[in-house]
């Protein structure tokens, strides 16, 4: 496969055809054009989740990572309440670079009233540039949930 996002046809054949719907609590599953999942957590509350990797960005990678994931969740009408970060750094990365990424992430989270609720950080020779994946968690009343499938700017 080529570098970049996997094509729609490959996603349909290799990913979505392999996934089965098992839980009635899952109201919306990710799919073509659907960036969020929605899970009924009771009392007319729905948890909205989305995850995005950031690759190839050298400047403000932490800022970009939070904004992209928060935007996905906000597009469903949900309030973003927290994020989990997975940061994989190439061998030789200096601690100051990691500190800057986390400062960017925390600055954006502060502006948006989002909490960093957890994550994972490691150095690996499997990557040659930083890879940040942010998973966002939001909440909304079930009756207010919007599907992002097919939305256009």
Describe the function of each predicted region:
Residues 18, 23, 62, 94, ...:
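Residue-level detector of solvent-exposed, low-hydrophobicity positions
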Residues 37, 135, 139-141:
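Residues located in well-ordered beta-strands
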Residues 139-153:
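Acidic/histidine-enriched ion/cofactor-binding microenvironments in catalytic or ligand-binding pockets
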